[in-house]
Amino acid sequence: MLLGRGLNGNAERQGRAVMSRHWLTRRLQSWGDRPALIWSNESWSFRQLCDGRDAWLRHLAQHGVKPGDTLAICGDYSPKLCALLLAALVNRNIIVPLASATAPRWNRLMELAQVQFAVRFEGDDSWHVSGFDRAVSHALLRGLKERDAPGLVLFSSGSTGESKASVLDFDRLLAKFEVPRPAYRMLVFLLLDHIGGINTLFYGLCHGGTIVTTRERTPDAVCAAIEARRIELLPTTPTFLRILLIADAIRRYDLSSLKIVTYGTEPMPPSTLAVVREALPRVRFKQTYGLSELGILPTQSRDSGSVWLKLGNAGFEHKIVDGVLWIRSPSVMLGYLNAPSPFDADGWFNTQDLVEREGEYIRIVGRKSELINVGGEKVHPTEIENVLLQVDNVKDVTVRGQPNPVTGEVVAAKITPLGPEDPDTLKRRVRQFCHARLERYKIPAVIEVVLEDHYGARFKKSRDQTSIRPPADTDAGS
């Protein structure tokens, strides 16, 4: 329902007081008439964005949204939505961003986050406010309210079950941006409810850059935006970079303005990195590392063509225990709303990411939960995928373990061909290719040829638990 309470003068004055002492507010105001956001061919300056934030502070007071209330912000990166995000931060709300792509799940996610108010944005940037008769009972949310601190609730993709809800202190998450950094014209690619999307938005705004949005995240739409808006920095995923290569979009557009491509959310296949570097030889490629629970950590790639990276130590510590990366930092999440605490007694967070170390550099292998146990031999899907992606006429591949009564598990691969080919012929070629490059137990025993995509709205490879269908004549080693 739409709420319409009278303006609360005390709340407005209190909001202005907090706003005046917040470093981010002063920073944004200092950029004045610089372009802050380009959306649907419309440019908003930092001055307009700040004016929009102030208008939202009045709207929040009128609708009875008090500091500490949980507020869902539903939509994409429109000017009014971004202004509301800034206002909610100043108002010390617990913010629950929900991207349009997840709309079918909004009600369930709002229930998990104990949302009390929601603002839903339409495609034309119009909006409406709803209120819910819902008490906030979770200790983490109540703790933020008691500390008068703004919060952020982010959900995992939920590809292997119900989404986990991470609760973060928004001020702590943004503290790293107080140190001035270079400004870029950036395309915001990752979704509003993704830690990478939040990081891109606030990096750009905090350093006087320009955030450019695109209504579609297709190869042509993204490359057209880079060409038209002279984008300098593209944050994306390895999966989308491979899609760009397959679509041949890089060749069809002028991408000469592009200086940096950052990639994360999943391990980068070295074969994909090599090809995309060849296609964009003047671009610097940088691997990022982050999780909803951690934020995005400072990293340094060994070089533009390497999947090895060095984790910075500004504001956090890391260690490797039994091949798994652990992180400790003041900005790490406070905990989950709907899962046990992943912290040990000393405050270390178990990322569940397997890594290899080489001096001061590490390589992200993948999730520990995705390891395949073939008769006691450990196989990680990313190793096999990197080999299979080099086979002619393979567009995409997903590898995972499949139960087997003899070996416990076998390697199973789901392959999408680039062009028409007899499935049996493709399977034979794949196995022949693997025989020269992989140990016998790593060669896929089960191969399914499919036509659908292997990724979801976040352009990250989806590894659901659905078994790959074995053919009747499966031979687990041939």
What are these regions (language model features)?
Residues R58-A101, L191, K378, P417:
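Conserved AMP-binding/adenylate-forming
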Residues I73, L234, S329, Q352-K442, ...:
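AMP-binding/adenylate-forming catalytic core of the ANL superfamily
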Residues L174-R185, D193-L233:
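Conserved AMP-binding/adenylation subdomain of ANL enzymes
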